[in-house]
Structure formats: C-alpha cells, structure tokens
C-alpha cells in the first residue's frame, strides 16, 4: 500500500509544533502524530518586543531531527506561521536589525500618518487589505523613517516562513498568501505595488516575486544525509487553516479561532467596495486563486493574557465558572486598539468597562465571561457584515483551530449568531499545511477532495442555536460599543 509521509511545521504567535502526517493513499486514511510542541513567547529586549528566531529554529530542527532519527523519510516538509512580520538579511544571508513582533509599539500612530498622506480609499483600492496598525506597510514605514546604517546592509526581506525556508534550504522565496498580509501587494496583479514601495523608500530588490502554494522551495539536508523536499504551502497560518476547514458550501463562513480569531468566506473574487472598506474587510490570498475575504478579531489573546497575568492553570474550571454567571453583564469591544498589547490585560478590560458605565468584572470568572460574551457578539457582527457584503446570508459557521475545543464558546456563538456551528478539526492550520503538500505531490486531486477526506478522518461537532431571551437589548449595547465614536476621548490608542 502506497504511503505518503508529510511534515508540517506550524508556527503560531504563542506556540509551535512539528507534526508528522501519514496518508495511506489507497484508503485515504490520514493520521497525525505530534513530534515536537514548543512555546513561542515574545522577548522584550532593546526596548522592543521581538521574536526569538534562534529558539524557533532550534525547535524546528529538534522536531525534524527526531523524525530523521526514527528512520522516516518524509516526502515533503512545509512551514506556516502568522502574517505581517518579516526578517531582513544582508547579501551574505545574515540577519540585519531586530526581528520585531507585530505587537511592538514602534508602529503606534504610524497608520494614521500613512493614511493621512496616501488616503485610506487609495490604499484599500490598491491592496484590498484591512487597516491594522501593525501591518507590514506601517512596520516598514516606522523602520524607514528611523534610518540607520543597518538599512544600507539590507539585501532581502523575507516573511517569517520564508526565513525558515531559507534556513533549511538556502533558497530565497516569497510565498503569496503570507505576502498578501503585508498591505503591499497589488490586489489586481498579485505582485508588489511599486508605488507603495517607493513611498516607503523600500528598494524593489529586497523582495522576490511571490510564488504560489505548492512551489518547490529546495532540499533540506537531514543529519542522516537524506535530501528532503521543502514545499511552499499556504504559509500564512490562516490560509492553511482555511484549507483545513471542511467547508460544506459557499454559504458557510469559517472562523479560525486561536490567539487571533479570523472570520471570513472563501471567494473567487475580492471585495474592495466602499462597503467592504467601511467594515474593514480584508482580501488575503488563498489557494487555487481564491481570496480569503475576512476580518481579524482580537480572539483568545485576551483570555491568554488574563490567564498569564493571574496565573490561571485550570482553563476548564475557569470556563465552567464563567458559564455559570449571568450572560452579557459586562461587554467590551475586543477589537479596541487598547487590547493589542496592554501592560495589564485584566486592568485594561476593567478600565474599559468602568469608562463605559458598566459593571466592572473583578473575579477571574467574570473577566472570562466578559471576554466570551464580547467575542460572540463580535462574531455575530462580522457574520452579518459578510452576509451584507455578498448579498446572501451566512447559513453556517465552521470553527477550526484550538478555540474550537471550547464547547461553551461554540454554543454561545451558535446562540448569538443564530446559525448552526460546526467545530473542528483542532489542528486545521497543520492539516491545511499538509493538504497543500499532498496536492503538490499529486496524492490528492484538489481542494475539494482534500476537504472530503478530512470529514472522514476527523470528527466534527455540531452546535444548534437556541433562542436567547432579551437578546435584542444586549445586541444594541454591543453595537453602541463597537462604534468608534463611542470610545472615550483619548482612550482609543494602544496603552503604552
């Protein structure tokens, strides 16, 4: 029986993993085995939030070396990660400058400057990408406006997965789905926008032409001497997660739920109308020529930070306690900039509630309940926005990723959005990474065939919406909070 062994390196903003997938091609039976899981934490050094790229590389190699020591010869290796962040290299392939994180505060206020100079409408028409203060466009504006001798040394700019491609193979490539998150890619031409680069002062030579998922990057020399193929997958983890979401129709929306919540639809055409701009909808690159028409939501980052700050170890007990509390007592707008990276998340939540005349959540369970209720309401808002944009309602929400394990939040989403919710698979980005490799190898015919295979190999859990009494009043409260003009004066900017 023919077998394909595939390695997926899946790097998230808080953790990473090296996974081994085995596909028995005759039966289409797919299994996953976790080889190595590791944390990915921000490092605050030289007054900036940075990624520890050396630690990530060590962990990637730890997983790959373990597979090699097992005597397994992978047919391919693929890497995906979060978007917008980049690495600069000199002519010799050595890193230049700091590996900044998108949560670093050096971009505070930069987006306002750029949009004032270029115009939001003009930028959106060119790129179709939502306005987030940490987009690569604004990171590079901050970099180039504070010039140093380092800039003269730069020869290459690589997104995070492409940097690790380079470290494994020595090949310099730029994969399309991650490049699309930069807000520097032409929506129409799917290549770099020269006018935006000129505005920044970024030389075109820094950037390779984007390649599509499935591109053969090169070979990794394993300790055993084996030469293992490295394939460019949909290297933006959300793009891979969408591949790994077994959507049942074009009337289904996906929600990749983790540190970030990314909700959207799969579309053959982008949406960059004034209505889409007003909703801050993004059109990121997908596989097979599709667009990921979606919206970024702050996601479980809020809960992760609260748990970290308050040393909460038993997440299950916290969720159970939160579920027992009255619903919608205290609400926040999770996408308020103050929640991007405050010194204290629980204090930022309390301050927000106090400023908006709401009960202040004090206990751990009250904080968690506030986060869950607010996220569910924001999910409803985006579901409605997507339906209006496509002139057809969203009829089902498919939740994938780590957050899909939260049964309480899944049911809350179904109740608040008033549509059925399907949850799973948990490792959607890993599976999408694997799917891209299997399609490149010809082991799976196409995206539809891969998703069909997923439904037969990984269980899905269905949540049916229940009627919520007095919901209309809570919804009006949240809608008022989500309007920018309701933010107290001087409180919109990210907390320093």
Curated annotation (Swiss-Prot):
List the catalysed reactions. L-rhamnulose + ATP = L-rhamnulose 1-phosphate + ADP + H(+)
What the entry lists under InterPro entries is as follows: ATPase_NBD (IPR043129), Carb_kinase_FGGY (IPR000577), FGGY_C (IPR018485), FGGY_N (IPR018484), Rhamnulokinase (IPR013449)
| GO MF annotation, one | ATP binding
One GO BP on record is: rhamnose catabolic process
> According to its UniProt record, which cofactors does this protein need?
Mg(2+)
Gene3D superfamilies found in the cross-reference section: 3.30.420.40
Enzyme Commission (EC) number: 2.7.1.5
Top enzyme class, one word, equals: transferase
Q: What is this protein called?
A: Rhamnulokinase
Q: Which organism is it from?
A: Pectobacterium carotovorum subsp. carotovorum (strain PC1)
